[in-house]
């Protein structure tokens, strides 16, 4: 038979309007859903601090600092035998899917994921990376284990599509979006995500205005929240408005920034930079014909390949790191300014540059954090 399971990983810190919306949806649909409301202290990346690269929602060791009380219907670590303290939130998602598949003795398990390729390069790559097993050759599917799949039915929806559908069908929605609109936040920047990750850092200061009670509790929850809330959307860490101090090149400014960091943090950035430089020299990143022409127009030395391992019409381009480049597709081009932005945003994983965590990096991070836990 068929069964509908609703899984929500509760990250403890959220706008009260978001929590109200989730509660409303769950209550309205309890007759058709088997609800798993998960409150587990897995590790979650944070970009608010140079010293704390992750935090744990619902960490029993910091119960006195919790931003809110745990929901009464919460499922805690004792319900999930696969959980361990080294686990990241995305690791938990995968292991939960496997566990549920076995618990239900299912023939096949499908996990619907609401990501859209428009949201970020990493989400675009989830769909189009071309090196994955699929369900019946549907490109918006990924096999994560035998007979266990992730499906991304909204992968090609634009932000405007969501609101057109909402207006047409009269769906309930998170009223936080109304406040975002009234605050002048553009549609494509209205994110309802964990407030400490890089994608949400620019809107972090809105907590002070929209949900001051939650903001007051957040200050003591994760290191660096106050700074990120003040400067996350200004020259100090802004992506578009960052300015180079007088007398520096972007490379020398990057070297200065690295010199101010703790050794283990600095080494992680240097490892990412080394990998990126080698990648662009030896393999090359894929760029559109339009971007390639912009590089040619600026007399930037490049080597263009014929094909790529990715399923894309873009061409692989090998090139050296630039100091800076003033084009709309700035994020796609390797530059020391791009690296500076990662450092200023406390983007420990260099997600802004298109990096994703590897298992080896997770292990290195675990070892480093264990070694330096007395100062974190």
Segments (PLM) and residue ranges:
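Nucleotide-activated chemistry modules centered on ATP-dependent adenylation/adenylyltransferase
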Residues: 1-376
């Amino acid at each position: 038979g068929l069964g509908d399971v609703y899984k929500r990983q509760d990250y403890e810190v959220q706008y009260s309007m978001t929590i109200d919306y989730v509660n409303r949806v769950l209550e309205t649909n309890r007759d058709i859903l088997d609800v798993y409301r998960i409150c587990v202290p897995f590790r979650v990346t944070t970009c608010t601090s140079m010293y704390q690269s992750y935090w744990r929602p619902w960490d029993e060791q910091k119960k006195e600092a919790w931003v809110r009380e745990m929901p009464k219907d919460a499922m805690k670590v004792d319900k999930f035998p696969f959980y361990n303290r080294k686990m990241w939130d995305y690791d938990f998602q995968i292991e939960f899917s496997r566990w549920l598949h076995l618990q239900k003795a299912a023939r096949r398990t499908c996990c619907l994921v609401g990501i859209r390729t428009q949201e970020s390069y990493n989400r675009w790559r989830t769909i189009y990376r071309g090196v994955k097993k699929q369900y019946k050759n549907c490109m918006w599917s990924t096999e994560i284990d035998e007979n266990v799949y992730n499906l991304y039915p909204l992968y090609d929806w634009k932000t405007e599509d969501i609101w057109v559908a909402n207006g047409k069908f009269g769906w309930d929605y998170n009223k936080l979006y109304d406040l975002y609109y009234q605050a002048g936040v553009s549609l494509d920047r209205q994110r309802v995500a964990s407030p400490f990750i890089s994608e949400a850092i620019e809107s972090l200061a809105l907590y002070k205005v929209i949900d001051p009670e939650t903001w007051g509790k957040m200050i003591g929850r994760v290191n660096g929240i106050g700074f990120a809330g003040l400067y996350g959307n200004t020259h100090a860490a802004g992506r578009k408005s960052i300015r180079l101090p007088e007398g520096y090149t972007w490379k020398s400014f990057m070297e200065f920034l690295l010199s101010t960091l703790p050794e283990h943090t600095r080494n992680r950035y240097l490892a990412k930079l080394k990998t990126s430089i080698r990648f662009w020299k030896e393999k090359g990143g894929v760029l559109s014909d339009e971007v390639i022409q912009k590089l040619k127009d600026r007399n930037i030395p490049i080597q263009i390949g014929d094909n790529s391992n990715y399923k894309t019409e873009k061409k692989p381009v090998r090139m050296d790191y630039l100091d800076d480049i003033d084009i709309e597709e700035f994020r796609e081009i390797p530059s020391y300014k791009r690296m500076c932005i990662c450092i200023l945003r406390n983007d420990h994983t260099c997600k802004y540059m298109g990096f994703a965590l590897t298992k080896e990096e997770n292990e290195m991070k675990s070892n480093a954090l264990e070694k330096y836990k007395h100062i974190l």
